[in-house]
């Protein structure tokens, strides 16, 4: 009972943008690749990538672990940080743990974490 390519494509077509973004991120982590890298850089990237990451991390991800008791305030902060619509922000908060922002600077990640924690959320910066 193998899954066909058509079934996979049909499943992906029915995913929301947030679900699809999470799928891409999980695939990038599982296979150690980046969907945003140009082909020329991707060929040289795996050899240089881990060494650079060990030196100093420059890109951070803000992960919403839970909304806490004040979910409405957390949704408002998520909307302000991400420019998502109300439904998308609510889906993101309801689906925690979820990445709120990815690939951002250390300062921006700290600011986002501060805002979310002040709203009552449990947040992790990776």
Swiss-Prot record:
InterPro entries: Ribosomal_bL12, Ribosomal_bL12_C, Ribosomal_bL12_C/ClpS-like, Ribosomal_bL12_oligo, Ribosomal_bL12_oligo_N_sf. GO terms for cellular component: cytosolic large ribosomal subunit. It comes from the Bacteria. GO terms for molecular function: mRNA binding; structural constituent of ribosome. The keyword Ribonucleoprotein applies. It holds the Pfam family Ribosomal_L12_N. Keywords: Ribonucleoprotein, Ribosomal protein. GO terms for biological process: translation. Belongs to the bacterial ribosomal protein bL12 family. Homodimer. Part of the ribosomal stalk of the 50S ribosomal subunit. Forms a multimeric L10(L12)X complex, where L10 forms an elongated spine to which 2 to 4 L12 dimers bind in a sequential fashion. Binds GTP-bound translation factors. Forms part of the ribosomal stalk which helps the ribosome interact with GTP-bound translation factors. Is thus essential for accurate translation. This is Large ribosomal subunit protein bL12. It comes from Geobacter sp. (strain M21).
């Amino acid at each position: 009972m193998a899954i066909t390519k058509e079934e996979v494509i049909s499943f992906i077509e029915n995913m929301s943008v947030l679900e699809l973004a999470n799928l891409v991120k999980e695939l990038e982590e599982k296979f150690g690749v980046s969907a945003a890298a140009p082909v020329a850089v991707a060929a040289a990237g795996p050899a240089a990538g881990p060494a650079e990451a060990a030196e100093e991390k420059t890109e951070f991800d803000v992960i919403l672990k839970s909304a806490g008791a004040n979910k409405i305030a957390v949704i408002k902060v998520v909307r302000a940080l991400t420019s998502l619509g109300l439904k998308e922000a609510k889906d993101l908060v309801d689906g925690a743990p979820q990445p709120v922002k990815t690939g951002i600077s250390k300062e921006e990640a700290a600011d986002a974490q501060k805002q979310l924690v002040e709203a009552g959320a449990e947040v992790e910066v990776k």
